[in-house]
Amino acid sequence: MNNLYLGVDIGSVSINIVAIDEENELVFKLYTRNSGNPIELVKEGLAKLREEIELENYKISGVGVTGSGRQLIAYVLGADTVKNEITAHARASTYYHPEAGTIFEIGGQDSKLIIVEDGIAVDFAMNTVCAAGTGSFLDHQAERLGVPIEEFGGLALEADRDVRIAGRCTVFAESDMISKQQYGFTKPEIINGLSEALVRNYMNNLVRNRVLEGEYIFQGGVAANIGIKAAFEEEIGAEVIVPEHHDVMGAIGIAMLAKRDVKRSGQESSFRGFDLTEQEFETTSFECEDCANNCEVIKVIADSKVIAVTGDRCGKWTASLIGDSAANANVEGSSEKEEKTAAKSSKKQDEDLNKNSEELEANLYKVDLEKEKQVMKELEELEKSDENKKEDNSLV
């Protein structure tokens, strides 16, 4: 029986599911829009996986989950590895392109810059505040212009003139595009101007004064837009590589990491199995008022049983899964054995998430302490200078 490893990337706009074998060959790939119910979409994705491959010849030996919605889906699937998108994207990029030094990643709602040295992510930047330049913004503009999103990038290359579009804000960008339309500029010229503006915005907000080296990799859903790719190449003066599976690189990376972690541990996968496609899942929440934190505690319920509790900073409600009816209030039929199993899984996921956060901070953030001390020193000198001025003025 052959081993398969699942990778699931839960984004705000898309949900990606892949399966790789022992040689990291892609056996299954699914890219689907997130319509607002990630649990149901993941269940549908697993059902498609079961339909497309002969499961009697394969065994799911590891499951990894990444993306902004990773916590909930990790509990639902029984994931072995849960990591942030930066780590997952860097893993896949450096596997396919060992010389990768700079990774541009633009998704549906955010954009990322990842700096890689010797196959390891050493620095990164994310823009989660402004939607300008993200996939959802481009979708909206394509719809407004009456252009299929698949043709959006190609039209940019047909522009005869350069048109400057404001790209720092979605509101200003759209207003400027409308203004340029009224002045008679063509759709290709406006789309090309928008592409260049969004790349300028990316460079100003994320790259800033960072030194970009190595191969330049462009991934995420927006990487399919050849207009944006061309704008990046013009901006940096170098070739930009778009991987074959640019749209699911996060899922591929987390699948690879899950395979690594399972082999290191020597334990069986925690995957709940394909039967979960037949289960009904429900999420409920309440505000804990036992301390000043007022945590929003989220419970995940499957077939009338609490399988996970998250959101409590102190771990009180997570721990209450073991032999305590508090977590299972309003839930009937939870056996002690099942509660202990769920609590163990929930605790493991929380530990993994905390560990991942610590690793991210330790490995990706390089805090220049000497510079910080210098800034503090300058502030102290400035304060002393102000005090001396006040004293001099009082003597006059």
Regions found by a protein language model. Give the residues of each.
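Glycine-rich phosphate-binding loop plus the immediately following alpha-helix
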Residues: 35-39, 118-161, 169, 260, ...
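Short glycine-rich, Thr/Ser-proximal phosphate-binding strand/loop in the N-terminal lobe
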Residues: 4-47, 124, 128-129
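Short beta-strand-loop/turn "lid" adjacent to the catalytic site in phosphate-handling enzymes
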Residues: 30-35, 53-86, 122-123
